[in-house]
């Protein structure tokens, strides 16, 4: 980027301001993008101060892309949602060389690359390799070369508007350069903080008596999500571009590597640690080369990213779920450190899972200070023989979730104590149980347990349960945290005056929720059973229970043997149902829900005892037009005999009943060798004469 034209005099404020802006932007580009600073800090500060003074004296000369506009604006009240025109997808992860080899094979197979007789690909795939930064993914929008908006990744579909904060990041150009400037461009990249800048920031935090940041990523995240952009402006954030969303007005580069080269001509910062390689061997060579230099890099990375280089090949491979088939994030092995395990507590999850958690002497590992680490479950503690007082190896799995890998046995003190799983839930005092075939111990408190309360309420309100429209997670959070709701029964005691006091809950929203709660009082037995959130009981099992018993009380009082008579209920499900209703807290909540007619449903007689004939448990498919029976009548007769009537033929089909004009189902049955019956044969089978 060339130096600015001849320096105008101070007597020409408009020209002087334009020259100062150009000179400061040129210096920013040299410093942040080229990493070749050519203007001393003191001189930069002098020119910056002069531009501020001119703009203060001549407000009409202020431009949106002036370097002075990076210092931050008014404090925002919150972040506005932004829907991404092109989703910001996550990447599939690889953790080993084998994962990379498998990825390369999938790509080569997907592109129909030729192979020799030994199965070796003869035309290896070309890949673009980059670093995987440990920062925050951001999308920058430029319109006709001018920066207009920035948004976070969010959930990949919707992020948050952080335009004013991103405007303060000096490495991000407010105006694109070059001749091929598009009408619209979404640049995808990463906001991060260099290690040297992180160290200086923490020095400032210490000097000011403020809390230090644990690692550069946390510092970058905390800086970017400030409501006051002046605070963001004071933080040394950087940016690297690595991807693209929307592009309009110029032709899309035909390779990923040429896209990054083009970005550089636009003045966007692109990391130089990148390469174009071929095949799995090239990928692994890049990975191990970067890994050897990882600690000497000026920023934190947690792996490298591989992308099929050619754009047309990316398009052919497409996407699976929420990730592209043409890319892989190859993560570095987790980092480890030694520390002392001072205690083992248990945490109760939202589904009642009891998880042992190690309390550790603080240790810096994987870029963060770790004081707690998961021990997964009781079996893992026993298998690893981890004891309170041990010196342990701590690892940040995936550089994110700390875990205790093992104890250092030759350092075990004489007074080290074994972990004992509590028999009562620390949150509610309910019994803790662990089924024989499961590794996880669970609190049986269910609807009563505070730790499970939010999840229980959310499940209770779901569309397939009691369908309480308007009762979302954020409302549930407020109701529980303000102690307005302890159990699902409390929902029906909520009044209009209570609801309108909730944060961001207008009168209309309050009335809509009241109406929805009133409507939810009239449900079905199957929906009510499902809404209780009994472990292992989904919609289908809830319907089977309702159909088999007819009313709730027999279900609540049923023995395990009686529950096992229900269609598709096995020992684990029967035990779960029995234990749920054996818990006094759960019965209390159910009685509260039924009391005073709060929640009602039509009840019926129990279903007839399940048939024990030849069709019991068999799968039957109907096809074509039967001589005397409608399809529905035949289905009812078969189901009454204990058969399951399916809609398609598979290897699991036992019989096919075919009438006139039977089509592909009949052909499929003959192909699979499945017995085919006409209507008369079906009647014989129903009567027990056929075998």
Curated annotation (Swiss-Prot):
Gene3D superfamilies recorded for this chain?
A: 5' to 3' exonuclease, C-terminal subdomain, 6.20.10.30, BRCT domain, DNA ligase/mRNA capping enzyme, Helix hairpin bin, Nucleic acid-binding proteins
Name any GO cellular component annotation.
Answer: cytosol
The answer to whether the entry has keyword Zinc is: yes
Q: Which residues form the BRCT domain?
A: 610-691
* A GO term for molecular function: DNA ligase (NAD+) activity
Which residues are involved in binding Zn(2+)?
Answer: 425, 428, 443, 449
* Enzyme Commission (EC) number: 6.5.1.2
Which NCBIfam families does this UniProt record tie to the protein? Answer: dnlj, PRK07956.1
HAMAP family for the chain: DNA_ligase_A
Question: What is the taxonomic lineage of the source species?
Answer: Bacteria, Pseudomonadati, Pseudomonadota, Betaproteobacteria, Burkholderiales
Query: What SMART domains does its record include?
Result: BRCT, HhH1, LIGANc
Question: What reactions does this protein catalyze?
Answer: NAD(+) + (deoxyribonucleotide)n-3'-hydroxyl + 5'-phospho-(deoxyribonucleotide)m = (deoxyribonucleotide)n+m + AMP + beta-nicotinamide D-nucleotide
Protein name (record): DNA ligase
**Organism encoding this protein:** Burkholderia thailandensis (strain ATCC 700388 / DSM 13276 / CCUG 48851 / CIP 106301 / E264)
Q: Which residues does the annotation say bind NAD(+)?
A: 41-45, 90-91, 130, 153, 190, 307, 331
> Which GO annotations describe the biological process of this protein?
DNA repair; DNA replication
Q: Does the keyword Iron feature in the UniProt annotation? A: no
Q: Look at the named UniProt entry and state the broad enzyme category this protein falls under.
A: ligase
Instruction: Name the residues annotated as catalytic in the UniProt entry.
Output: 132
Q: Which cofactor does it need?
A: Mg(2+); Mn(2+)
Database matches in SUPFAM superfamilies: BRCT domain, DNA ligase/mRNA capping enzyme, catalytic domain, Nucleic acid-binding proteins, RuvA domain 2-like
Q: Which UniProt keywords apply?
A: DNA damage, DNA repair, DNA replication, Ligase, Magnesium, Manganese, Metal-binding, NAD, Zinc
Protein purpose: DNA ligase that catalyzes the formation of phosphodiester linkages between 5'-phosphoryl and 3'-hydroxyl groups in double-stranded DNA using NAD as a coenzyme and as the energy source for the reaction. It is essential for DNA replication and repair of damaged DNA.
The entry assigns this protein to a family as follows: Belongs to the NAD-dependent DNA ligase family. LigA subfamily.
Q: Which domain of life is it from?
A: Bacteria
């Amino acid at each position: 980027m060339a130096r600015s034209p001849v320096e105008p005099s101070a007597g020409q404020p408009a020209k002087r301001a334009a020259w100062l802006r150009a000179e400061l932007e040129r210096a920013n580009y040299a410093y942040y993008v080229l990493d070749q600073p050519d203007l001393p800090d003191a001189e930069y500060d002098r020119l910056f101060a002069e531009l501020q003074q001119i703009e203060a004296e001549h407000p009409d000369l202020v431009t949106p892309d002036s370097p002075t506009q990076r210092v931050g604006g008014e404090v925002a009240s919150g972040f506005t949602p932004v829907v991404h025109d092109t989703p910001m997808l996550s990447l599939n992860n690889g953790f080993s060389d084998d994962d990379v080899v498998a990825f390369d094979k999938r790509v080569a197979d997907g592109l129909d690359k030729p192979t020799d007789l030994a199965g070796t690909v003869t035309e290896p795939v070309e890949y673009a390799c980059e670093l995987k930064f440990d920062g925050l993914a951001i999308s920058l929008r430029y319109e006709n070369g001018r920066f207009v908006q920035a948004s976070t990744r969010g959930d990949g579909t919707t992020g948050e508007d952080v335009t004013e904060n991103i405007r303060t990041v000096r490495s991000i150009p407010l105006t694109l350069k070059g001749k091929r400037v598009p009408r619209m461009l979404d640049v995808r990249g990463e906001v991060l903080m260099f290690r040297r800048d992180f160290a200086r920031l923490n020095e400032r935090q210490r000097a000011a008596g403020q809390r230090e940041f644990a690692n550069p990523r946390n510092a970058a995240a905390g800086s970017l999500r400030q409501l006051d952009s002046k605070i963001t402006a004071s933080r040394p954030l950087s940016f690297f571009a690595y991807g693209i969303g929307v592009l309009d007005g110029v032709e899309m580069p035909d390779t990923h590597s040429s896209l990054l080269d083009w970005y550089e001509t636009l003045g966007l910062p692109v990391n130089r640690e990148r390469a174009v390689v071929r095949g799995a061997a090239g990928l692994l060579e890049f990975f191990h080369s970067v890994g050897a230099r990882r600690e000497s890099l000026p920023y934190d990375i947690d792996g490298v990213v591989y992308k099929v280089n050619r754009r047309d090949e990316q398009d052919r491979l497409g996407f699976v779920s929420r990730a592209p088939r043409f890319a892989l994030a190859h993560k570095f092995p987790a980092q480890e450190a030694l520390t002392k395990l001072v205690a083992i507590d248990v945490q109760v999850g939202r589904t009642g899972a009891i998880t042992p958690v190690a309390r550790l002497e603080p240790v810096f590992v994987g870029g963060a200070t770790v004081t707690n680490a998961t021990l997964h479950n009781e079996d893992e503690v026993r298998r690893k023989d981890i004891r309170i007082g041990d010196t342990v190896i701590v690892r940040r799995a995936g550089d994110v979730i700390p875990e205790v890998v093992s104890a250092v046995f030759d350092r075990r003190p004489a007074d080290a104590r074994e972990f004992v799983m509590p028999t009562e839930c620390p949150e509610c005092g309910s019994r803790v149980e662990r089924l024989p075939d499961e590794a996880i111990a669970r609190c049986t408190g269910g609807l009563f347990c505070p730790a499970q309360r939010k999840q229980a309420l959310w499940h209770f309100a779901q569309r397939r349960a009691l369908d309480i429209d308007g009762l979302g997670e954020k409302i549930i959070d407020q109701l529980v945290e303000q102690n307005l709701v302890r159990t699902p029964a409390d929902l029906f005691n909520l009044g209009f005056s209570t609801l309108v006091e909730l944060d961001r809950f207008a009168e209309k929203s309050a009335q809509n929720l009241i109406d929805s709660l009133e409507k939810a009082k009239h449900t079905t037995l199957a929906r009510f059973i499902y809404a209780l959130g009994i472990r292992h009981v989904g919609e289908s099992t809830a319907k089977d229970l309702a159909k088999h018993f007819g009313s709730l009380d027999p279900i609540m009082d049923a023995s395990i043997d009686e529950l096992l008579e229900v269609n598709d209920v096995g020992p684990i499900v029967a035990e779960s149902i029995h234990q749920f209703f054996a818990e006094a807290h759960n019965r209390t909540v159910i009685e509260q829900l039924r009391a005073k007619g709060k929640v009602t449903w039509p009840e019926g007689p129990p279903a007839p005892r399940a048939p024990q004939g030849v069709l019991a448990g068999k799968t039957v498919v109907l096809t074509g037009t039967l001589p005397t029976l409608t399809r529905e009548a035949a289905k009812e007769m078969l189901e009454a005999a204990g058969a399951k009537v399916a809609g398609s033929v598979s290897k699991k089909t036992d019989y096919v009943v075919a009438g006139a004009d039977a089509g592909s189902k009949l052909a499929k049955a003959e192909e699979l060798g499945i017995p085919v019956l006409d209507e008369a044969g079906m009647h014989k089978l129903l009567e027990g004469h056929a075998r």
